[in-house]
Amino acid sequence: MSSSYINVIGAGLAGSEAAYQIAKRGIPVKLYEMRGVKSTPQHKTADFAELVCSNSLRGDALTNAVGLLKEEMRRLDSVILKSAEATRVPAGGALAVDREGFSQMVTELVTNHPLIEVIREEITEIPEDAITVIATGPLTSDALAEKIHALNGGDGFYFYDAAAPIIDVNTIDMTKVYLKSRYDKGEAAYLNAPMTKQEFMDFHDALVNAEEAPLNSFEKEKYFEGCMPIEVMAKRGIKTMLYGPMKPVGLEYPDDYQGPRDGEYKTPYAVVQLRQDNAAGSLYNIVGFQTHLKWGEQKRVFQMIPGLENAEFVRYGVMHRNSYMDSPNLLEQTFRSKKLPNLFFAGQMTGVEGYVESAASGLVAGINAARLFKGEEALVFPETTAIGSLPHYVTHADSKHFQPMNVNFGIIKELDGPRIRDKKERYEKIAERALQDLQPYLDK
C-alpha cells in the first residue's frame, strides 16, 4: 500500500496505545476521535483513554495475571502504563489512578507526539485508503458498528456493562466507617462501611425491590460477570453479594470501633468498600457497585449503607451496551482482519475484557500494523506470556460459545514438568518464565 501513514480510529485505551506504538516506530498516524464533536452517554470528557467504569487497573502483583500483563506492558513501553504509574492513587495491592489526571496525561503524551495528527471527527465507514486500526470501543457509534457487524455476517454480539456511583468524601460520616485494606495488604486504602446481619438483610431487600432504569434496547440482557450490576447479583441469592463486593473476610473491625455489631464477632456480617477515585482524595467510588437502578433509587438504597446516610453522589451509576466481535472467525492472533488484510481491530470490541486487556490489545495491534506498513513479518508474542496468551485465546476460542475474557493464568500455557501444587509458587514460576520469554521481543 502506497499510503504514507496509518489510521487509528478511536482514542480510548486501545486506540491511544496503538497510535503511540505506531508513532514510536517512526510511522505517521492519523488518530480519529469523535468525542469533542460528538459525545456518548457514558463519557464525561473529550480526553483520551477516559475510564467510564472503575478507576482501578486491578492487582499489581506478579502472582496476579493482570499484574503480570501490566509488567509485560511496562517493559514494552506502554503509554497507558506510563500514565497510570504517574497518576496512581492509594489502593492497597491494586493499581488505581486519578481518573481525570490519568486521561489528561494520556491525551497529552499522545497529542504531543510529533508523528501523531489528532482529527476530531466521527468515522462512519471502514477506511480503505491506508492500513487502519479500529479501536472504537464498546460504545462504537451506530453507523460504524453496522459496517463492522456486516463483516461479521450481520451477527452483532453484545453484553451489558455498568459503572459504580462516585461520592463526595466530605459527605461520608467518618465515624461509621474505617480505613483498611483486605488482609492489611499494602497501605490502608479503602474506606469500609460495616453492616450487621439485620442491616444487610434490610439493604438486600431494598436493593432487589428497587426500580431499574429501562434498557435502550429490546435485546435480551446479557452481562459480563466482571462488571455485573449489583442488583442483578443480589437477585441471584441473598448471600451472593457476601461472596462478592460485600465480602467481609480480612476486614475485621478496628480496636476502637464503637458502632453496632453482631455480638462479639470481630468481623462484620457484610462490608461495603469505598475506593479513592482521584489524586486529591475528594471522591470515592463504591467498589463493585455497578448499577442500572434509577438515580432516585440509587440515592435511596445506597444511603442505607452505614456512613452514607447523607452522601452526595457526584456521579450516579450507569449501564451501557458493549458490542464485541466474533474474533475467532474474524481475526488473526495479531488482531489483523482475516477478510480485509489492511485492517486491524483492538480493544473491548475484540472480546478482551478490562482496561489493561484493552490497552494490551492496542499494543499488539499497533506493533503489528507498524510491521505490516514496513513490510516486516507479523509479531506473535509467545503463549507463555500474558500478552501472547490473551490474543491467542480470543482468536482461537470456540466461536459458538465465545464470551469476553479477562487475562488469567488459566489461558497462559502451563509450565513444563509436574504441576506445582502451591498456587502462589506456580504463579511465580509462570511469571518468571513469561518475563524471560518476553525479553527477545522487547526491541521489535
Swiss-Prot record:
Alphabetized InterPro entries for the sequence: FAD/NAD-bd_sf, MnmG-rel, MnmG-rel_CS, MnmG_N, TrmFO
Top-level taxon in the UniProt lineage: Bacteria
Subcellular location: Cytoplasm
Enzyme class: transferase
EC number: 2.1.1.74
This protein's UniProt keywords: Cytoplasm, FAD, Flavoprotein, Methyltransferase, NAD, NADP, Transferase, tRNA processing
Chief subcellular location: cytoplasm
Recorded catalytic activity of this chain's protein: uridine(54) in tRNA + (6R)-5,10-methylene-5,6,7,8-tetrahydrofolate + NADH + H(+) = 5-methyluridine(54) in tRNA + (6S)-5,6,7,8-tetrahydrofolate + NAD(+); uridine(54) in tRNA + (6R)-5,10-methylene-5,6,7,8-tetrahydrofolate + NADPH + H(+) = 5-methyluridine(54) in tRNA + (6S)-5,6,7,8-tetrahydrofolate + NADP(+)
The protein's required cofactors: FAD
GO molecular function: flavin adenine dinucleotide binding; tRNA (uracil(54)-C5)-methyltransferase activity, 5,10-methylenetetrahydrofolate-dependent
One annotated Gene Ontology cellular component of this protein: cytosol
Binding site for FAD: G10, A11, G12, L13, A14, G15
GO BP, sorted A to Z: tRNA methylation; tRNA wobble uridine modification
Role played: Catalyzes the folate-dependent formation of 5-methyl-uridine at position 54 (M-5-U54) in all tRNAs.
Family per similarity comment: Belongs to the MnmG family. TrmFO subfamily.
Name of the protein this chain belongs to: Methylenetetrahydrofolate--tRNA-(uracil-5-)-methyltransferase TrmFO
Source organism per UniProt: Streptococcus sanguinis (strain SK36)
Gene behind the chain: trmFO
